[in-house]
């Protein structure tokens, strides 16, 4: 634990995470200052009166006179004033670093471009099934610092690349990078390797690393070593085994669970299950408890979730697929009896959509592209694509064409903010329209 008494602390960014940092320091007798570039940031009404705040811009005088700067994950370390502060020897951390300095229980740390919320939640459920006191949070649910307020035998943290950039004291009992695909190109101007380098921080000081045997970018820089266990579709210590039309989860050559007993849908979710099982084994969660949790877990909202089914047509809400890799995962190994009606569109964040092309082949697929980058997506295979301005317009076209055995899949490969407040609102709208039109 670190003594912060007498330190001049400035917190950049309010919101839930910023407020958790304020509470953390107040509980230790330190009154921090808060700066936020927004005039009316979320959580402002909950900020205690004694905490000085500067809104609408970054207060350079405060930052350059600080002993410690706690930066929100949304603030790039490349921001000029933070570069100046770092050059001046001022320590810059994030909330996860503060958490790691205080945590007294083992930590399972999970990152990746896609699937991390599902795996984080699933490992937490596995621990609960064993009767453990577990704190689950970080980039999902509760801010990590709030987890310190309750006793825990295990912490399970979802961590973003942004959070890992400001973390040096993480000593995970088990850590994983589930996958690495292009994302956040605005934050990582030097491309995929810069993004991957941020993710790789998770393996530093980890007792055990769980790597994706199908994705070399998830490997530690020095390659797999004695600390590593692997998962994958067909290879890895934890992999899928297909026999006589059935698919099993297999660990070290032993079949442990038939996927028919799992409520999660799709090959990408089966590999998520394998990763969760590997992490659970690493921290000695009893296997029986882990499998019990796995068979009862229904998944997270907006993540390849069945929104509606009628007359043999399934409407699948995968609105959380805000990047190309997520949509690739959804389409990989997807089985549809009839035609797949795929909804793509939104704000692609300057991403390269071409990796989707191999998944868009065949006669039984139709594309419906909408939003800011709808035209670019329709160009991937124009002969089967239809472009509309909005998702609702596209769904009304689909409703006229569906037949029993078809699937309507919203897996947009794009952020939602060009037309929606959030991916959640986009998914809710899809579900509402599915029920109306189905």
Curated annotation (Swiss-Prot):
It is an enzyme of class 6 (ligase). Keywords: ATP-binding, Cell cycle, Cell division, Cell shape, Cell wall biogenesis/degradation, Cytoplasm, Ligase, Nucleotide-binding, Peptidoglycan synthesis. InterPro entries: Mur-like_cat_sf (IPR036565), Mur_ligase_C (IPR004101), Mur_ligase_C_dom_sf (IPR036615), Mur_ligase_cen (IPR013221), MurD (IPR005762). It catalyses: UDP-N-acetyl-alpha-D-muramoyl-L-alanine + D-glutamate + ATP = UDP-N-acetyl-alpha-D-muramoyl-L-alanyl-D-glutamate + ADP + phosphate + H(+). Pfam families: Mur_ligase_C (PF02875), Mur_ligase_M (PF08245), MurD-like_N (PF21799). GO terms for cellular component: cytoplasm. GO terms for molecular function: ATP binding; UDP-N-acetylmuramoylalanine-D-glutamate ligase activity. Its EC number is 6.3.2.9. It is found in: Cytoplasm. GO terms for biological process: cell division; cell wall organization; peptidoglycan biosynthetic process; regulation of cell shape. Its main location: cytoplasm. Belongs to the MurCDEF family. Cell wall formation. Catalyzes the addition of glutamate to the nucleotide precursor UDP-N-acetylmuramoyl-L-alanine (UMA). This is UDP-N-acetylmuramoylalanine--D-glutamate ligase. It comes from Pectobacterium atrosepticum (strain SCRI 1043 / ATCC BAA-672) (Erwinia carotovora subsp. atroseptica). The gene is murD.
